[in-house]
Curated annotation (Swiss-Prot):
Compartment(s) of residence: Secreted
Originating organism: Pseudomonas amyloderamosa
Active site: D401 (nucleophile), E461 (proton donor)
Cofactor annotation remark: Binds 1 Ca(2+) ion per subunit.
Keyword rRNA-binding: no
EC class (word): hydrolase
Quaternary assembly: Monomer.
Pfam families, per the entry: Alpha-amylase, CBM_48, Isoamylase_C
Annotated Ca(2+) binding sites: D154, E255, T256, N258, D285
Protein name stated in the entry: Isoamylase
GO biological process: carbohydrate metabolic process
Length: 776
């Protein structure tokens, strides 16, 4: 995840006084939090957690926005920090609520105790916006239930773009948010099936990362009313199956701030396209639903999952448990002013990690406040949310944004500069600590076995901001990781020759599964998630068509702030007059071949199959525009690239030798110099060598063919001498990514391979390209 603004400095931390002991780990949602009907649908029970509240009142509404409450009910303590009330449905109807039930909470606590003369917009009872223990209760702010299964609307929306109504502090504390605030929606359990979950081993997957809205928003083959919705995405299951994709990974679909995206047409104003500002961890985002009635988004999401499952495709979700949409304090000099939607107004010190004096928030996310992932109650919410999405919504796996924050062993009330678990202050990644969230998740869920079967696939983005948060290779067994080093080193190999030292040893390690990162922890090649590009950065085409980022351009391709300056991109000499579009396509074919021919689990970005471009924008988080929406009307060159990608993926799926369950042995994989000699230490250690080849002994890995791959990183041609293929066979060309082979048949169909020869045959390979042969 990229953030629009990164805080200039992370804040220190100190001991938090007065925080109660955390309850022990328990079964999934053992506190029965949330709002639920009884079996007869005669009563609704509302249960919410707050360890520090002194009073909580339930407010019921007949609509999600713009109306006053129809009824109120005071909750009672139910033990272990839980507050509860059961309300007869007959009473709710008598109050005038005959359709969907919308609800929220108002809470009082030590910094704002209840006063009998309090009324909405009143300051009665007020002591402080934040007290010495970090409490931030404010009864003028209606609070969204953290366990609500659907949300009525976002805080900012076409009817309200004023975020001040949700703020604390002297200027805003008495502003009542009731009519504006997002409400929870009480749901009757859905009967919509999610189909049968695929049990395929992760090593056999090809993952396709895409945004739900962007997937179909401008797809004219889909009826207009379904474009950009869960329903529309489900209609693309056959498209992904035809491409060869086996798992679709959606950018965040939990309720996020995006209802204001269309308020100012053709502008980036107020836009949050990617969705990394979560407002609730249980609710599917209503904006992505065709059916926006109560229960509609839930059932529609489930139906989408069923459509993908029916096509044999897994459904993964990008989840954001490192921070929330509430962010941190508005400034670093005023601790009193902060946004209050939900968690903060219920139990600030439970849900967020606080700094010295408990007035501010510790932040490794760039958004202002770490979610308090070492706290058991906060962990319960994470686990309960994951269980809901896996069990009720049918999701097969999760990609964890800034997952290093979930390995934080620092906790409010337990950290000092010298504390054993927090030697660096308020953040310390510690995979050996059994109580960190990443290990709690492993205990609570079954990870899919290596050979396939039931379970979840878990993917970490293994970095955050500051401290020891860069943890590529540092996660425990059971976790797979986005391999940013794979991306960087292979981009460097293609685009930085002459600008930096290129290590062919690193390229070889990438091709064979990145054992240097994952083997020592007992993991396997498929735990490396191999990608050249994802949403966070340039597209595949732009990596090979841009000399740097251009984020300041006009709508629809900008402007966007932020973005890295380390892209390792190059336009292949186009701007210098030494390259052409055909060279850019060659480079893109080579990059995608790296991705699909390497040991590991390949991850591609939606649109890479047709060379989608963002015109060099590398941080388009804020563009809900045609630039970010996939298109299905292609040029001839784009159609040719699609055929290349489709056949490349099919080749990977047809050859188990490319999908090893364990690390290649010396007899299974042999590295060769261009001369045909086996690569020795002298060759590996010479940083002037930019060409390498390898042969995989297919029969030893259950494959009917052996495979030979040659990569020439030089700018000029290199002659490769082929090793001996298996007895009785010869080498046949499947693809050569060189310019001469640009067109509809760059990657040939099975059975159409071209005979090259046997041992000692020479092959001239053009600069910066890849050759793929099979034995037959």
């Amino acid at each position: 995840m990229k953030c629009p603004k990164i805080l200039a400095a992370l804040l220190g931390c100190a001991v938090l006084a007065g925080v109660p002991a955390m309850p022990a780990h328990a079964a999934i949602n053992s506190m029965s939090l949330g709002a639920s009907y009884d079996a007869q649908q005669a009563n609704i029970t509302f249960r919410v957690y707050s360890s520090q509240a002194t009073r909580i009142v339930l407010y019921l509404y007949s609509a999600g926005y713009g109306v006053q409450e129809s009824a109120t009910y005071t909750l009672s303590p139910a033990g272990s920090g839980v507050w509860a009330v059961t309300v007869p449905v007959s009473s709710i109807k008598a109050a005038g609520i005959t359709g969907a039930v919308y609800y929220g909470y108002r809470a009082w606590g030590p910094n704002w105790p209840y006063a009998s003369n309090w009324g909405k917009g009143s300051q009665a009872g007020f002591v402080s916006d934040v007290d010495a223990n970090g409490d931030r209760f404010n009864p003028n702010k209606l609070l969204l239930d953290p366990y609500a299964q659907e949300v009525s609307q976002d805080p900012l929306n076409p009817s309200n773009q004023n975020g001040n109504v949700f703020a604390s502090g002297a200027s805003y504390r008495t502003t009542d948010s009731g009519i504006y605030a997002p409400k929870g929606v009480v749901l009757v359990p859905s009967t919509q099936s999610t189909g049968t979950k695929p049990t395929r081993a992760q090593k056999d997957d090809v993952i396709y990362e895409v945004h739900v809205r962007g997937f179909t928003e401008q797809d004219t083959s889909i009826p207009a009313q379904y474009r950009g919705t869960y329903y529309g995405a489900g209609l693309k299951a056959s498209y992904l199956a035809s491409l060869g994709v086996t798992a679709v990974e959606f950018l965040p679909v939990q309720e996020t701030q995006n209802d204001a995206n269309d308020v100012v047409p053709n502008s980036d104003a107020n836009q949050n396209y990617w969705g990394y500002m979560t407002e609730n961890y249980f609710s599917p985002d209503r904006r992505y639903a065709y059916n926006k009635a109560a229960g509609g988004p839930t059932a529609e999401f489930q139906a989408m999952v069923q459509a993908f499952h029916n096509a044999g495709i897994k459904v993964y979700m990008d989840v954001v448990y490192n921070h929330t949409a509430e962010g941190g304090t508005w400034t670093s000099s005023d601790p009193t002013t902060a946004t209050i939607y939900s968690w903060r107004g219920l139990d600030n010190a439970t849900y967020y990690e606080l700094t010295s004096g408990n007035q501010y928030f510790y932040d490794n996310t760039g958004i202002g406040a770490n979610f308090n992932t070492y706290n058991t109650v906060a962990q319960n919410l994470i686990v309960d949310s994951l269980a809901y999405w896996a069990n009720t919504m049918g999701v097969d796996g999760f990609r964890f944004d800034l997952a290093s924050v979930l390995g934080n062993s620092c906790l409010n009330g337990a950290y000092t500069a010298s504390a054993p678990n927090c030697p660096n202050g308020g953040y310390n990644f510690d995979a050996a600590d059994s109580n960190v969230a990443i290990n709690r998740i492993l205990r609570e869920f079954t990870v899919r076995p290596a050979a396939g079967g039931s379970g979840l696939d878990l993917f970490a983005e293994p970095w955050a901001i500051g401290g020891n948060s860069y943890q590529l290779g540092g996660f425990p067994q059971g976790w797979s990781e986005w391999n940013g080093l794979f991306r960087d080193s292979l981009r460097q190999a293609q685009n930085e020759l002459g600008s930096m030292t290129i290590y062919v040893t690193q390229d070889a390690n990438d091709f064979s599964g990145s054992s240097n990162l994952f083997q020592s922890s007992g993991r396997s090649p498929w735990n490396s998630i191999n990608f050249i590009d994802v949403h966070d950065g340039m597209t595949l085409k732009d990596v090979y068509s841009c000399n740097g980022a251009n984020n300041s351009q006009a709508w629809p391709y900008g402007p966007s702030d932020g973005g890295t300056s380390t892209n390792y991109s190059w336009d292949q000499g186009m701007s210098a007059g030494t390259g052409a579009a055909v060279d850019q396509r060659r480079a893109a074919r080579t990059g995608m071949a790296f991705e699909m021919l390497s040991a590991g689990t390949p991850l591609m970005q939606g649109g890479d199959e047709y060379l989608r471009t963002l015109q060099c924008n590398n941080n388009a988080y804020n563009l809900d525009s045609s630039a970010n929406w996939l298109t299905y009307s292609w040029t001839t060159d784009q159609s040719n690239f699609y055929t290349f990608a489709q056949r490349l993926i099919a080749f990977r799926k047809a050859h188990p030798a490319l999908r090893p369950s364990s690390w290649y042995s010396g007899s299974q994989l042999t590295w060769y110099q261009p001369s045909g000699a086996v690569a020795d230490s002298n060759y590996w250690n010479n940083t002037s060598n930019y060409a390498i080849a390898y042969a995989i002994n297919g029969p030893s890995l259950g494959d009917s063919n052996s495979i030979y791959v040659a990569y020439n990183g030089w700018s000029s041609s290199v002659t490769f001498t082929l090793p001996a293929p298996p007895s009785g066979t010869q080498w046949y060309r499947v693809t050569d990514t060189c310019d001469w082979n640009d067109g509809a048949s760059t990657f040939v169909a099975p059975g159409s391979e071209t005979l090259i020869g046997g041992a000692g045959t020479t092959y001239g390979q053009c600069g910066q390209s890849l050759l793929l042969l099979i034995s037959k």
